[in-house]
């Protein structure tokens, strides 16, 4: 777990007495976490936030009265408090992330131990205590036009048909990745995306991106061909690696050991690209705690890839991009909102 020199003050918000007791007792067992109180609904939470001054709040998405999403929309513009969602397998979690929540965990459903759930939540709470809360505007389903792109596409067909883009993100990355993808055209070179996310959510995340972006986006399956106009989301709990198959490239999505503490791992993806890809490639590393992806991005740059890192000011957590920049893996830094423009300029050969 990330080490900090103080206890993180946590407010637990859940309408279920059983859930509140479980979370309060469970989180209190961690030496770097102090549960300072609990609230049973949004109205109760507003008062507790004012009186208890928590560093982080855990929030149930589904609550009677004002639900978690509406509560965040009201709260965060005036009180930018890091929030971790505690949610069942539900699309509403992405609406809450769009409203400004930092991260989320899936409620225990019998597929993982309660201790594993608490360990994951505690880790995310500590990370969230270091996060920068960014209030995000609602995303329009219509992607902004790119006036520099001709109807024929973003440039010469041959190079762009063969180009592969890898993107990795963690905490804060679900909305940051959307910010990038919604600014890209439908015929973007083939993309592979690793976003650290609990099991069950990557398919829903891919479906959401597919609705909001111009290119096709879907959760990858083992053996998928990487092709122009398609963005593949690496499935949770599988390692995703690019494999060369003659003149084609496919994505391997298989069980395996964690790499850099994660499965899927950005390092595993980027390292595979550095060793397997013999055509133009781009690596993008975005917001997230830790160092996953930094070494792999360095390997990509040494193999001739163009590499982009999200800048500090626009990151929810400036961890992975910072490490990548510090070791020389990043060719150019850009804000979340400008990464797409930097990428497009590179693909078109603009200087």
Short names for language-model regions:
Residues 1-11, 16-28, 32, 38, ...:
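Conserved acid/base catalytic micro-environments in cytosolic active-site loops
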């Amino acid at each position: 777990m990330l080490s900090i020199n103080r206890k993180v003050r946590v407010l637990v918000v859940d309408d279920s007495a059983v859930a509140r007791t479980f979370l309060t007792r469970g989180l209190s067992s961690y030496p770097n976490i102090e549960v300072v109180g609990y609230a049973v609904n949004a109205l109760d939470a507003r008062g507790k936030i004012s009186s208890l001054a928590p560093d982080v709040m855990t929030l149930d998405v589904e609550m009677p009265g004002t639900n978690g999403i509406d509560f965040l929309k009201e709260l965060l513009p005036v009180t930018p408090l890091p929030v971790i969602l505690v949610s069942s397998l539900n699309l509403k979690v992405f609406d809450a992330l769009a409203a400004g929540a930092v991260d989320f965990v899936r409620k225990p459903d019998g597929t993982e131990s309660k201790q594993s759930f608490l360990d994951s939540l505690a880790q995310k709470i500590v990370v969230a205590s270091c996060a920068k809360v960014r209030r995000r505007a609602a995303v329009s389903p219509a992607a902004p036009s790119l006036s520099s792109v001709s109807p024929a596409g973003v440039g010469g067909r041959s190079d762009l048909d063969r180009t592969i883009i890898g993107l990795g993100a963690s905490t804060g990355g679900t909305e940051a990745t959307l910010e990038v993808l919604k600014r890209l055209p439908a015929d973007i070179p083939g993309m592979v995306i690793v976003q650290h996310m609990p099991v069950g959510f990557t398919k829903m995340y891919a479906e959401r991106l597919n609705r909001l972006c111009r290119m096709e986006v879907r959760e990858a399956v083992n053996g998928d061909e990487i092709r122009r106009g398609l963005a593949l989301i690496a499935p949770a709990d599988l390692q995703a690696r690019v494999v060369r198959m003659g003149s084609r490239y496919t994505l391997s999505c298989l069980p395996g050991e964690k790499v850099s503490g994660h499965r899927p791992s950005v390092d595993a993806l980027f390292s595979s690209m550095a060793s397997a890809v013999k055509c133009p490639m781009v690596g993008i590393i975005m917001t997230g705690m830790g160092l996953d992806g930094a070494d792999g991005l360095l390997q990509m740059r040494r193999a001739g890839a163009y590499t982009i890192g999200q800048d500090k000011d626009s990151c929810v957590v400036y961890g992975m991009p910072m490490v990548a920049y510090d070791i020389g893996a990043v060719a150019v830094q850009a804000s979340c909102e400008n990464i797409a423009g930097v990428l497009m300029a590179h693909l078109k050969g603009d200087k």
